[in-house]
Amino acid sequence: MLLRFTKMHGLGNDFMVLDLVSQHAHILPKHAKQWGDRHTGIGFDQLLLVEAPNNPDVDFRYRIFNSDGSEVEQCGNGARCFARFVLDKRLTAKKQIRVETKSGIIELDIRSDGQISVDMGPPRFVPEEIPFEAAEQATCYTVDVDGQHVDMAAVSMGNPHAVLRVDDINNAPVHELGPKIEHHPRFPARVNVGFLHVVDRQRAQLRVWERGAGETQACGTGACAAAVAAISQGWMDSPLLIDLPGGRLSIEWAGPGHSVMMTGPAVRVYEGQVRL
């Protein structure tokens, strides 16, 4: 059978989006791996599935697969593309949408200027909830990475993140430390790794090594996690701007117990069909 799909991106973090509300198909991890290959498939960082909700209090169910076939809990840039997609496809007429993910419910707000704000929910710091192996909760942890002591914050934005502060974003050891920390035994579910350079109290630069995808042009949950880490450690103030290789996100966080708000663009690239 042929399935209609849409290619989209949020700041260069690119997605294949499938409407499984009006189309019916059983998508498996092997399909994500096959389609995600940039040489022999469609090519993307993540596959996003738009499904009918299980919960009557929400509008849609949102599932995410990395290009390696692994299913993940959350994707912030994908959430903005999800909102743009369901509106453009007339799956809803609402400008404010509630969506269930593997990690909980998020709220999407399509603004009049075309930007999309996502209520990502409150960050989680309890090690067991990230998950991260630590004797007790802390703002900063020192982790032994191949004999090198690396300081990092650990936080969950519905998916696990480690955040490292660096002095030079261009020479940050993303490809050296990224995969080592991603697979570090203290992160039993693997982890996304953010390399953060603080420019001033309102602006920072960020590169992210994403779990199951490698370095991407942008990572929405990574930007949220980096902002939370920077505010928690007293480096920055809310609201703030995070510059990623693919562009800029605006992040707001009022502190523990409060939701993180992320605002940025979502772009449709093309429509296509793929054989299942």
Swiss-Prot record:
Subcellular location: Cytoplasm
GO MF annotations, alphabetized: diaminopimelate epimerase activity
Keywords: Amino-acid biosynthesis, Cytoplasm, Isomerase, Lysine biosynthesis
Gene3D superfamilies for this protein: Diaminopimelate Epimerase, Chain A, domain 1 (3.10.310.10)
Catalytic reaction list: (2S,6S)-2,6-diaminopimelate = meso-2,6-diaminopimelate
Coiled-coil residue spans: none
A GO CC annotation given for this chain: cytosol
GO BP annotations listed: lysine biosynthetic process via diaminopimelate
Entry's EC annotation: 5.1.1.7
Top EC category: isomerase
Residues annotated for substrate binding in this entry: N13, Q46, N66, G76, N77, N159, N192, E210, R211, G220, T221
Functional note: Catalyzes the stereoinversion of LL-2,6-diaminopimelate (L,L-DAP) to meso-diaminopimelate (meso-DAP), a precursor of L-lysine and an essential component of the bacterial peptidoglycan.
The protein's name in its UniProt record: Diaminopimelate epimerase
Species name: Pseudomonas syringae pv. syringae (strain B728a)
Recorded name of the encoding gene: dapF
